[in-house]
Design a protein with these regions (language model features):
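Non-catalytic, well-ordered alpha-helical scaffold segments
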Residues: 33, 64, 252-255
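Ser/Thr-centered flexible coil motifs
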Residues: 28, 59, 209-213
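Charged, often Cys/His-bearing segments associated with DNA-binding zinc-finger transcription factors
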Residues: 1-52, 58
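Glycine/charged-rich beta-loop-alpha catalytic/anionic-binding loops adjacent to active sites
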Residues: 48-49, 62, 213-215
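Short, amphipathic alpha-helical "recognition" segments used to contact nucleic acids or chromatin
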Residues: 59-73
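Short, charged beta->alpha transition segments
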Residues: 53-54, 142
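Short, well-ordered secondary-structure "scaffold" segments embedded in the functional core
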Residues: 79-268
Length: 268
């Protein structure tokens, strides 16, 4: 595999070389082209560099690639910039300007029988203004994610909350409950206090075994619920969700963008 080399001798990853796409983004070339097309439709070409009289050095596909590579690898801006032949400050501007355009589109239409599955995951987050020490003994945020039980596509992400808060309260405070209004929602037993959520039957306090029919339903519930756990694991293949170094207020759009990339890997 050979890199494209610019006139100053700096190695550059380019979207014109399809062999760079999958290893550095997790997307196949066709999926990446879909991503670029969506960003263009959302106004990506019209976004200015931010410096008076200056044009972007990178084409829109290369800027989209930079964002996807950054999220996938979690390299620092000082590492990402030279890979694309730009300064680290230019890499910052690309991520800040295009990242929000990759966000997951809201679900506008839904069948009333479409079941959602929701779960939370801890995202190690260095911005202590939004993070808190959690059960993993790191400063983290609690990110709520919901998928469609049938398609396994991510349909909603919540606003990250401090990692020491329980799922039962974060479900409401993050806004994801509001996004899922009107459809059945499944979750584990940590979502007590949300009567609209379908949870497994609890073992009686007197120690008796559950009736067989309840035990069977719990088995089915657990099997279906595993789908959201698999989705969260796939989302964390974008390594930025394993150690979030950016300002905390950007995590919501980053997580939503990664949800969109995750969906592209399923739908193409």
């Amino acid at each position: 595999m050979w890199a494209v080399v610019d006139h100053v001798g700096v190695q550059v990853i380019s979207s014109s070389r399809s062999e760079w796409i999958a290893p550095f983004t997790g997307l196949e070339p066709g999926q990446f082209r879909t991503l670029v097309r969506v960003v263009a439709q959302r106004g990506g070409e019209a976004i200015a560099d931010g410096r008076p009289g200056r044009q972007w050095r990178l084409t829109l596909p290369d800027r989209v690639l930079l964002v996807a590579v950054y999220w996938r690898t979690n390299l620092t801006m000082r590492q990402i910039g030279p890979l694309f032949g730009v300064s680290h400050s230019a890499a910052h501007r690309v991520v800040d300007s295009l990242g929000p355009l990759l966000a997951l589109a809201p679900v506008r239409k839904r069948r009333v029988d479409q079941v959602a599955i929701v779960d939370g995951t801890l995202v190690p987050t260095r911005d202590h203004r939004i993070a808190a020490r959690s059960k993993n003994h790191r400063y983290s945020t609690n990110l709520q994610v919901a998928i469609d039980a049938d398609t396994r596509l991510v349909i909603a992400t919540g606003d990250p909350q401090p990692g020491n808060r329980n799922d039962c309260t974060v479900y409401r405070d993050s806004g994801i409950a509001e996004q899922l209004v009107g459809r059945p929602v499944m979750a584990d037993g940590g979502y007590q206090g949300n009567p609209e959520v379908i949870m497994p039957y609890r073992t009686p306090r007197d120690g008796r075994d559950l009736p067989e029919w309840k035990d069977d339903l719990n088995t089915v519930h657990r099997t279906v619920r595993a789908r959201v756990e698999h989705a969260l694991a796939r989302m964390k293949n974008w390594k930025i969700l394993r150690d979030y170094r950016r300002a905390g207020h950007t995590l919501a759009t980053t997580a939503s963008g990664i949800a969109f990339l995750h969906n592209l890997t399923i739908t193409g």
